[in-house]
Each structure stands twice: as C-alpha cells, then as structure tokens.
Amino acid sequence: MAGFGAMEKFLVEYKSAVEKKLAEYKCNTNTAIELKLVRFPEDLENDIRTFFPEYTHQLFGDDETAFGYKGLKILLYYIAGSLSTMFRVEYASKVDENFDCVEADDVEGKIRQIIPPGFCTNTNDFLSLLEKEVDFKPFGTLLHTYSVLSPTGGENFTFQIYKADMTCRGFREYHERLQTFLMWFIETASFIDVDDERWHYFLVFEKYNKDGATLFATVGYMTVYNYYVYPDKTRPRVSQMLILTPFQGQGHGAQLLETVHRYYTEFPTVLDITAEDPSKSYVKLRDFVLVKLCQDLPCFSREKLMQGFNEDMVIEAQQKFKINKQHARRVYEILRLLVTDMSDAEQYRSYRLDIKRRLISPYKKKQRDLAKMRKCLRPEELTNQMNQIEISMQHEQLEESFQELVEDYRRVIERLAQE
C-alpha cells in the first residue's frame, strides 16, 4: 500500500510539472497579434504605431490563446492606404513535437483563413510595395471632405469619404484586405457576400503629404445593405461599421454616419435607414448624429418640443433625413431634455411622465396578455395579487430605466455643446 501511495504522489507531481511546463507555451492572442498601418519605412520599428485586437476568439477559441510557443508574435502589417500586407509569425521557442504527444497550434494556418493570398512575408518585399504607394487612390465617388484639428493644435488633417462598389477597379481585392480587421474588432463579425449588388460601401481616408506627393491612408468603412420594401421602396440597413484604432476618438464615426444619411436623402425611393443588431456604442453615435441633423428643423423648435411628440416630427425627420419613427422619438426625447429646465418641478414632472409613458407601453401590453392567460389557470384573487406584485416591480424598473436613459441623453447633449 505504501508503494502505491508513493506512486500516486509521483504521478500527481509529474502531472503538475507537465501542466506547468505546458502553461509556459500558452500565449494570449490578443497581445500576440500586432497590427500596424505603415506610411514610412521607419514605422516598421516604431512600437507607437502598433495596435492590438479586441477579439481573437473567432480564430483562437473562447480562451483566445495559442498553444505551443514562447514569445509568440503574429505580425500583420498593412501599408496605410492600399492595405498591402506583410504577415509573419515569430517566436522565441516552440514546443517539442515529441513532448508528451502534444503539438503546437497551426497559427499561420488560422490566420491564412481570413487574409487573402498575395501577402508579403519579408520586410524587403513590403518596403518595395511601400515605394509604390503613391499610385494608390481611393475608390468610388467622393461624397464629403472635412478637417480634424491636430491634438497638439496648429495643424488640420484632411479626411474624405467615398462611396464605392465592386465595379471599381481593384476594389474587390482591397475590400478582401480591409474586411480582415472586422475579425479583430467586432465580436460577432462575419464576411459578406460581395457578389450581391445590393451592398453599398462607404470608405473614409486621410489625405496627407509625403515627400511632396499626395497620399491616402485608410481610416475606416461602413457596409450598407439595401432591403426591398413593398411595393417600390428600399430600406438601407447598416451592417458593419469600423473606424480603425489609430483614428478612434476623432469624430470619424459621426462624420461617416452623417454622410451616409445625407447621401440617401437624395433618393425618393429610400424609406428610412436602420442598423443590423446595433451595439450600445453605435446607438450612442446614432443618437448624436440624428439629433445634430434634426435640431434645426422647425418641427423640433422649443415651442413644438414642449407640446409633446407628434406626427409632424415623424414626417419631417423621415422626409429630410430618412429617420424612422422610433429614432425620431429618441431625437424628440433628447431635444426635449435639452430645452427642459430640470430645476423647475413642473417641467421636470412633465418630461418624466412623457418618457415613462413611452417606456411603460410594452409592460402594460405584457401585463394584459399575462392576465388573460392566468384567468384560465388560477383563481381571480390570486391573479390580482400577483399582478399587484408585478406592478410594484415594474415601477422600480421603470424609474431605473428612466434614469439610465436621461444619463445617456445628457451625454449626447454634452457632445452637441462641444461641436
């Protein structure tokens, strides 16, 4: 028995040692993948230019790790405009294939699943492509030009927004490179069917000078799908929107979304613009853009706002900027908050009740449906009692929802004040 115990202890210790050794060969792919947008040769050695993915689970699993390497680096460097790519895997050491019958993950194979062929693997070839970048020009039709002041002041950076499609020469290949960023920055990203002509593409570029020549750098993009609405309308739906990390926080998302709305206003057949599974950050962005667009419309004057939400607001928002009724209501609520004196008890009460009436509508419907079902299953007294409990819970949830909404609306108003 003593011998058996010693053997068991040895096995436990051996297993622990093996697990510890294997753990040394696990790498977090969110930090192992290094992304870079290259404009100048010196950018290759400049760590300030490096940025990292937010998500890698679609290629490397829920734990977002790669096994089998120490000091793993997955280099994905892109020339800033054309997005010509250099892909290389580097590491300090790799697990021995004979080590306890384990083998390293095929990191290169996983990355090849999403990046198109034709990439470089060495620096010299990449620098040769960089020298030809002066020939790269944006695709499609120029829609909008705007400037952003340098954070240090004294210099304006110029940006342009273009609309493109797959008939533009070279755009299909460019888009294949561009869409790879989705996997790193959108949690549920997937690639679209580019052969479907209903897709529209909106691209943001920075226009800059290099050695006396004008060049362009990719900033971000949006894809929009045009759904058919019976009998003769379309409803553009925003599917994907991404501003690359080095350009975030500079207002490009707002410029892009506003430009898209203004573009579609020119088409009488467009009913309104929606979004596919919008994130919280997208909803905040949309709130800001739509309020900015609508704030000077006559139907959203202070006098009209204080009288409550009405059909004129719905019609004018739809006709002027392709905004649907639900979004027009949010615009009204934000602008109503802007003109409401919250220190005035009567104005505050009127605003609070107006918002809560809208918030409680689905609760009331749910309660009516629930009451009908329970009458078939339980005595009336018990049903009434349970309904009272639900009403109490609804009031708490309603107040919480109201306060959260007001907080979100105030952030939009603060941003408007900074414009």
Curated annotation (Swiss-Prot):
Acetyl-CoA binds at M241, L242, I243, Q248, G249, Q250, G251, H252, G253, A254. Changing D277N: Strongly reduces HAT activity. Catalytic subunit of the type B histone acetyltransferase (HAT) complex, composed of RBBP7 and HAT1. Interacts with histones H4 and H2A. The interaction is dependent of the ability of RBBP7 to bind to the N-terminus of histones. Component of the histone H3.1 and H3.3 complexes. It comes from the Eukaryota. Residues 62-64, 225-227 are annotated as: Interaction with histone H4 N-terminus. Changing A317P: In a colorectal cancer sample; somatic mutation. This is Histone acetyltransferase type B catalytic subunit. Phosphorylated by AMPK at Ser-190; phosphorylation increases HAT1 activity. InterPro entries: Acyl_CoA_acyltransferase, HAT1_C, Hat1_N, Hat1_N_sf, Hist_AcTrfase_B-typ_cat-su, Hist_AcTrfase_HAT1_C. Induction: By viruses and interferons. Up-regulated also by estrogen. The record marks W199 as: Interaction with histone H4 N-terminus.
